[in-house]
Regions:
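Glycine-rich N-terminal segment of FAD-binding domains in flavoprotein oxidoreductases
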Residues: 1-20, 35
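FAD-binding subdomain of flavoenzyme oxidoreductases
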Residues: 22-26, 32-173
Length: 173
C-alpha cells in the first residue's frame, strides 16, 4: 500500500487476500465485472480493455492496489473529478462479518431501489466492519479519445481560478 493502509497499529492484524485474485465474471451486456478482492486494479483493466471497457478509478498505486483495497479505502485517482471514486462503481459486495457470517449486499443491476444500500457502509471503512471478499463493479466503455494537459501558473490563486472556470464551463476534466 502506498498509503500505509497495511501498517498494523495498536496490536492490529493484517489479512492477506492477494491469492483471492480471480476475475469471476465480466458481463459486457449488463456492464459489470464480478471479482475477488485480491484482483489488482491494472490487471482488471487489461482484461476489460480487450473487450472495450474500463474500471475508471485509477489510484496512483493501480499497478499494485487491489479492488478490495480500493473499496476498503474508497480509492479515487487523478480521473476522480470526471469519473468519481470507487464508491461510484460498487454495485455489490460479499463481506465476511466479525461473527464469521457471509453477507451479500447490492445487486448486479445499475439501479437497485429495494432496501438499504449496505454496500456503502463498508466502502471506505478500511476493513473495520468486515472483510470484503468479492466485489461487483460497474464498468464503462473505454473513451474514444484521451489526452493529458499540463498548465503552470505564477500564483496559486490563478490556478484556483482556472480550475473554477473549467469546472463551471461545463468541461469535465
Amino acid at each position: 500500500s502506498l498509503s500505509g493502509g497495511v501498517i498494523p497499529i495498536n496490536g492490529g492484524i493484517i489479512i492477506d487476500l492477494s491469492r483471492m485474485n480471480r476475475i469471476l465474471e465480466v458481463s459486457i451486456e449488463n456492464r459489470y465485472a464480478r471479482v475477488q478482492a485480491g484482483v489488482v486494479c491494472d490487471d482488471l483493466n487489461r482484461v476489460l480493455a480487450k473487450r472495450g471497457f474500463v474500471f475508471p478509478p485509477d489510484p496512483a498505486s493501480s499497478t499494485v492496489s487491489t479492488i478490495g483495497g480500493n473499496v476498503a479505502t474508497n480509492a479515487g485517482g487523478i480521473k476522480g473529478a470526471r469519473y468519481g471514486t470507487t464508491r461510484d462503481y460498487v454495485l455489490g459486495l460479499q463481506v465476511v462479518l466479525p461473527t464469521g457470517e457471509v453477507m451479500h449486499t447490492g445487486s448486479y443491476t445499475m439501479k437497485c431501489v429495494s432496501g438499504y444500500d449496505l454496500a456503502k457502509l463498508f466502502i471506505g471503512a478500511e476493513g473495520t466492519l468486515g472483510i470484503i471478499t468479492e466485489v461487483t463493479l460497474k464498468i464503462n466503455p473505454l473513451p474514444r479519445h484521451a489526452m493529458t494537459a499540463v498548465a503552470t501558473y505564477g500564483k496559486l490563486e490563478d490556478a484556483g481560478k482556472a480550475i473554477f472556470q473549467t469546472m463551471t464551463s461545463g468541461v469535465i476534466p
